[in-house]
């Protein structure tokens, strides 16, 4: 499938099949994130892969939604603000832009692998920090 077909096919998925994700499919998604362009190739993203039932339950708790994660894996895209490219004219660290690019690449790769995906930004970071 070409890029336009892939972009048209990608959509937000909120209910997932009750079957495991093939390791090679997960690796392909992670590799897409690694290949994504970032400011001066600093690669400030840190990707946490959550697959255990306990970890997925904690993610649901952080979203204040016990039904939030029927997925078999959740990828948390984080940024290291000490390892990002900083614009010289205003001192702004572009880690959020970089993380967004990485996430977009990974969402498209998930679609290419036949996996459903959902970009979620509604979560309580304090709950995640404690856990």
Regions found by a protein language model. Name each.
Residues 33, 75, 84, 90-131:
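Small-aliphatic-rich amphipathic alpha-helix that forms the alpha element of a beta-alpha
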């Amino acid at each position: 499938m070409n890029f336009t077909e892939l972009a048209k096919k990608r959509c937000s998925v909120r209910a997932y099949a009750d079957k495991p994700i093939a390791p090679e499919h997960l690796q392909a998604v992670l590799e897409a994130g690694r290949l994504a362009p970032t400011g001066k190739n600093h690669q400030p993203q840190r990707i946490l892969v959550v697959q255990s039932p306990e970890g997925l339950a904690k993610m649901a708790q952080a979203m204040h939604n016990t039904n939030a994660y029927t997925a078999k894996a959740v990828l948390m895209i984080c940024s290291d603000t000490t390892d990002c490219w900083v614009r010289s004219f205003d001192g702004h660290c572009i880690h959020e832009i970089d993380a967004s690019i990485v996430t977009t690449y990974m969402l498209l790769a998930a679609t290419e692998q036949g996996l459903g995906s959902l970009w979620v930004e509604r979560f309580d970071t304090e709950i995640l920090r404690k856990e």
